[in-house]
Amino acid sequence: MTFPVEKVRADFPILQREVNGLPLAYLDSAASAQKPNQVIDAESAFYRHGYAAVHRGIHTLSAQATESMENVRKQASRFINARSAEELIFVRGTTEGINLVANSWGAENIRAGDNIIISEMEHHANIVPWQMLCERKGAELRVIPLNPDGTLRLEVLATLFDDRTRLLAITHVSNVLGTENPLPEMIAQARQHGAKVLVDGAQAVMHHAVDVQALDCDFYVFSGHKLYGPTGIGILYVKEALLQEMPPWEGGGSMIATVSLAQGTTWAKAPWRFEAGTPNTGGIIGLGAAIDYVASLGLDKIGDYEQMLMHYALEQLAQVPDIRLYGPAQRLGVIAFNLGKHHAYDVGSFLDNYGIAVRTGHHCAMPLMAWYGVPAMCRASLAMYNTYEEVDRLVAGLTRIYRLLG
């Protein structure tokens, strides 16, 4: 069955606009995906007809808003096949989710002389929190190096584990290279040494189904805005046994059971003790609509279409003179490249003149840029609403830039 890309595109109003007098070719979904009408309408309807502060309210609007919010928690739980909805914490996004783990579980479990393993391809969000934690605790941060093709040197990973390894924090899919890491193999190694595993799933959940129980990871985190949902909302999954032991990171309303000036404070049960303050309820409603939307299309069908588009794009881009493509042949979502000796910003600016939106810069992955010896890369990302025609426009634009700049 052919993927209904034109029908999908019709659901995204922004794709109807022009940039610099040309139809928009939006190839930057790995930074943030566009939103379908179904998400926009769901969040708008909530604010128009159903908004109220959640929790503890006895009036109808508050009770309905609370029920809607908790239904999305259940929905997101099914989306990643968690054992229980109470293993999911609403966070602002992947970055906050990782920081929560570092400042709650990490603060309690990392000691001087321990070590944490990450990789050279990580987003800064999965580097900096662990650097900060290791500096505070006197722990060591160990790094899995890269192969030239953009995959990880797994033979080195085996040498990094020891009996003081407490955590493997690894990206599911690289936001620059598109590399999908072999999580089952890596998690199995971590288990042999008693280490916990955190997976940054920000670049994975929109491309194929994720099953956290099958993966057997301890933490899994992703953002809504890359999944065609609103900004400012994400999901942190934590295995229940770990979650019950973790102390809260932020204090305030909604995360307490009792507060006494004389006797101190007791916490609400998990996951609510990790959700201090008024939540982004509108964003949560929008996230639920986004999950519904991709589920209605079928993640397997989305993935199949995106893979066909990716193979075509890699074949066509390889024909552009003086282009350098980064990453493995088999990848998800993104294509990073440079054109000759021209700075990525210049190439991206020319493409913008042609109505083509790509991301340029270090992509919050400075260690990866350093490994490749470049200050920046261009990155085109492919989503379910992108087309073969847009790939052709990208290739034609790069060829034109080459001819103009040499």
Curated annotation (Swiss-Prot):
It is found in: Cytoplasm. Its EC number is 2.8.1.7, 4.4.1.16. GO terms for cellular component: cytoplasm. InterPro entries: Aminotrans_V_dom, Aminotrans_V_PyrdxlP_BS, Cys_dSase_SufS, PyrdxlP-dep_Trfase, PyrdxlP-dep_Trfase_major, PyrdxlP-dep_Trfase_small. PROSITE patterns: AA_TRANSFER_CLASS_5. Its cofactor is pyridoxal 5'-phosphate. The modification N6-(pyridoxal phosphate)lysine is found at K226. It comes from the Bacteria. GO terms for molecular function: cysteine desulfurase activity; pyridoxal phosphate binding; selenocysteine lyase activity. Keywords: Cytoplasm, Lyase, Pyridoxal phosphate, Transferase. The active site is at C364. GO terms for biological process: cysteine metabolic process. It catalyses: (sulfur carrier)-H + L-cysteine = (sulfur carrier)-SH + L-alanine; L-selenocysteine + AH2 = hydrogenselenide + L-alanine + A + H(+). CDD domains: SufS_like (cd06453). Pathway: Cofactor biosynthesis; iron-sulfur cluster biosynthesis. Homodimer. Interacts with SufE and the SufBCD complex composed of SufB, SufC and SufD. The interaction with SufE is required to mediate the direct transfer of the sulfur atom from the S-sulfanylcysteine. Belongs to the class-V pyridoxal-phosphate-dependent aminotransferase family. Csd subfamily. Cysteine desulfurases mobilize the sulfur from L-cysteine to yield L-alanine, an essential step in sulfur metabolism for biosynthesis of a variety of sulfur-containing biomolecules. Component of the suf operon, which is activated and required under specific conditions such as oxidative stress and iron limitation. Acts as a potent selenocysteine lyase in vitro, that mobilizes selenium from L-selenocysteine. Selenocysteine lyase activity is however unsure in vivo. This is Cysteine desulfurase. It comes from Salmonella arizonae (strain ATCC BAA-731 / CDC346-86 / RSK2980).
